[in-house]
Amino acid sequence: MSIPIPGIKDISKLKFFYGFKYLWNPTVYNRIFDKLDLTKTYKHPQELKVLDLYPGVGVQSAIFYNKYCPKQYSLIEKRSSLYKFLNAKFEESPLQILKKDPYDWSTYSSLIDEERIFVPEVQPSDHINDKFLTVANVTGEGSEGLIMQWLSCIGNKNWLYRFGKVKMLLWMPSTTAKKLLARPSTHARSKCSVVREAFTDTKLIAISDANELKGFDSHCIEEWDPVIFSAADIWPTKGKPIALVEMDPIDFDFDVDNWDYVTRHLMILKRTPLNTVMDSLGHGGQQYFNSRITDKDLIKKCPIDLTNDEFIYLTKLFMEWPFKPDILMDFVDMYQTEHSG
């Protein structure tokens, strides 16, 4: 059956959006789905299970279902006015609307392990899981910390990533997307983009303001060729632009705990050259790393300039350090770097 798509006339009557924004224009969604070409990954969409976090007004949910007819489509929405809206619009539809909190970790253990309402298939990590997709809208203020937690789960292979390499389609403020996709040596480079680069292949798919593209790497924009749409296509229309990114987990071969320790401490002092900052990893660190790093150009770099491979190289040296500190005794706030420099 085809699910009716909520229109802007009904959407605009809602009083509470809780600081989030939603694309409502079906024409723009068609352009986005054409660009994503999801059937390359999900060759048998009728076997696909989709978990939709913070679906809001459900326009994307309805369009996705009508286009791909997945086996199961579950919407996780606890916010009162939006939950009522979804129930009113999709009461007789195949969409499964669950009044649970996407922010609460216990939601997922309850959903998957206890109630077994939504049970994805575990697949090997040599490919993107072709029977499980996650989509989410975190366009509200303060979403960056939640995205960082999800990225950390990719590295630790827990949460939804215990089921393999699960693709995520993620709406966020364009300012967050710029920070997430920042390249080495750019002003927006932070621990957030370092983690993203280490654990995922992430692309900008769409954005609601062409002027925002100036904040991204020009070569990447040329490669990604994102869909550009208008602020008039989102509701509420006021406020910051939003962006959609596609996030695919990738293979990595390094010790995550030691890598996290090294990157976290170095990015706190991200504009200080390595030849003076290495004591931040532990007493005597500067002398040790100065003696081990043979590339004199690397030792002159600041953490903000380092590539993923260079961070991995420094982690390897750190693990070989006979007097390295006990990283389990480290209590540095993992988000401190996001608000520094």
UniProtKB/Swiss-Prot annotation:
Enumerate the residues binding S-adenosyl-L-methionine: 23, 77, 101, 137
Q: Which UniProt keywords apply?
A: DNA-binding, Methyltransferase, Mitochondrion, RNA-binding, S-adenosyl-L-methionine, Transcription, Transcription regulation, Transferase
The broad enzyme category this protein falls into is transferase
Q: Does the keyword Ribonucleoprotein apply?
A: no
GO BP annotations listed = methylation; transcription initiation at mitochondrial promoter
Family per record: Belongs to the class I-like SAM-binding methyltransferase superfamily. rRNA adenine N(6)-methyltransferase family.
Name of the featured protein: Mitochondrial transcription factor 1
Lineage of producing organism: Eukaryota, Fungi, Dikarya, Ascomycota, Saccharomycotina
